[in-house]
A protein has these predicted regions:
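N-terminal secretory signal peptides
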Residues: 18-78, 146-148
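Short, surface-exposed coil-to-beta transition loops
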Residues: 84-91
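Bacterial N-terminal signal peptides
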Residues: 2-13
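Intrinsically disordered, low-complexity regulatory segments enriched in Ser/Thr/Pro
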Residues: 97-114
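A short, structured loop/turn motif at beta-sheet edges
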Residues: 67-70, 94-99
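C-terminal partner/receptor-binding element of secreted or periplasmic proteins
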Residues: 20-38, 110-149
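Short beta-strand segments that buttress and anchor functional surface loops
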Residues: 76-82, 104-105
Length: 149
């Protein structure tokens, strides 16, 4: 009996350790899941000149996280263009209940000084028609980047 409990405890601990070693799902993975794929496609299909890295699945991404914004739960995350993250970033928000998605594309020109003071050179593009509250939230996410000056 004691041996069975010990084995069960070891198996449980091993299972938790294996789960802890698995990488967290990324925002890029979240938007390709069947639950969110239609919202993502709807959001970018209404736009013109969507950057190739954003329209394809060729992007670098952070793990998504669940956040409360004014009492509602959202999935939030970040993606960027491979090998050019500093100049091409996308911050996104998924509202799972309303089946909506919003995003902010931040790009920097190839101008001397742009990487040293990105806030002076950056251009912003909104996806999904976010309201002012959501735009402010997305801007706040960008300001948390330690390289954003």
């Amino acid at each position: 009996m004691v041996l069975a409990a010990l084995i069960a405890g070891m198996a449980s601990t091993a299972g938790m350790a294996a789960a802890a070693d698995e990488p967290a799902p990324t925002f890029s993975e979240a938007i390709t899941q069947s639950a969110h794929r239609a919202e993502w496609k709807r959001m970018i299909s209404g736009e013109t000149r969507v950057p190739g890295w954003l329209a394809s699945e060729n992007r670098v991404s952070s793990p998504y996280r669940r956040e409360q914004i004014e009492g509602a739960s959202y999935l939030v995350g970040w993606m960027c263009k491979p090998h050019d993250c500093a100049a091409n970033q996308f911050y996104g928000v998924i509202d799972e209940d309303a089946h909506r998605m919003w995003g902010m594309l931040v790009t920097l020109p190839e101008t001397p000084g742009a990487y040293d003071a990105p806030s002076k050179y950056a251009s912003f593009r909104w996806f999904g028609k976010p309201d002012e509250r959501m735009k402010a939230y997305l801007r706040d996410q960008l300001k948390q980047d330690p390289n954003w000056k």
